[in-house]
Amino acid sequence: LERIPMLKSFTVFNIEQTDGLNLDDEISPQPVIGFDPLPDVEALFQRTGAKINERGQQAFYQPLTDEIWLPERHLFTDAANFYATGLHELVHWTGAKSRLDRQKGGKFGSESYAFEELIAELGCAFLMVDLGVSGEVQHESYIASWLKSLKDDKRYIFQAASAASKAHRFLMEG
């Protein structure tokens, strides 16, 4: 059996830009997952004064506006993963010039970007332990870069851990 690849095109419309459709029968709402807030993490978010927006479907820190963007809580499988993601982005937030002034600016996939991600992952892990959060650490896409850097520079992990520790201390001690 021989396979022949074919290219098909489809016309796609953004449902929010259409009029006159009755979608109540077509789209069923997503089931709401129970969300148990973690008061210690919520208090940390408030205490930092970080501007945290819960919209969209991606998590990131936006240096230009000094804002953290998180997907809405109901999009996470559980509260712990929401908070782990928020803590990761909060560590990025500490790197702003007005705070700990960590160098950033690398593009996705660059060594400097991967280094900042390692700082954020380690800092997040430190915070999760202190705050009693048990969630998943997201680092699969950076492992190759980290391994290469670890082979090239034996101090790499210590430099990242030091920066993560400073971020942890900055956040926990206010």
Summary of predicted features, one role per range:
Residues 1-174:
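N-terminal accessory/interface modules of nucleic-acid-binding and processing proteins
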